[in-house]
Amino acid sequence: MPQLVPFYFMNQLTYGFLLMITLLILFSQFFLPMILRLYVSRLFISKL
């Protein structure tokens, strides 16, 4: 059914954007501060 092709791509685009936004929020709230804290603690320990 060729008339459904644009809706398929629109659906894929919508879920792709939702996935990107979710990943961005997850990384900015949870993973990146954890990595930064690990890096700062290693830096602090090596300065001792």
Curated annotation (Swiss-Prot):
One of its GO terms (biological process) is proton motive force-driven ATP synthesis. Its main location: mitochondrion. It is found in: Mitochondrion membrane. The keyword Membrane applies. This is ATP synthase protein 8. GO terms for cellular component: mitochondrial inner membrane; mitochondrion; proton-transporting ATP synthase complex. F-type ATPases have 2 components, CF(1) - the catalytic core - and CF(0) - the membrane proton channel. In yeast, the dimeric form of ATP synthase consists of 17 polypeptides: alpha, beta, gamma, delta, epsilon, 4 (B), 5 (OSCP), 6 (A), 8, 9 (C), d, E (Tim11), f, g, h, i/j and k. It comes from Saccharomyces cerevisiae (strain ATCC 204508 / S288c). Keywords: ATP synthesis, CF(0), Hydrogen ion transport, Ion transport, Membrane, Mitochondrion, Transmembrane, Transmembrane helix, Transport. Belongs to the ATPase protein 8 family. The chain crosses the membrane at residues 13-32. Mitochondrial membrane ATP synthase (F(1)F(0) ATP synthase or Complex V) produces ATP from ADP in the presence of a proton gradient across the membrane which is generated by electron transport complexes of the respiratory chain. F-type ATPases consist of two structural domains, F(1) - containing the extramembraneous catalytic core and F(0) - containing the membrane proton channel, linked together by a central stalk and a peripheral stalk. During catalysis, ATP synthesis in the catalytic domain of F(1) is coupled via a rotary mechanism of the central stalk subunits to proton translocation. It is a single-pass membrane protein. One of its GO terms (molecular function) is proton transmembrane transporter activity.
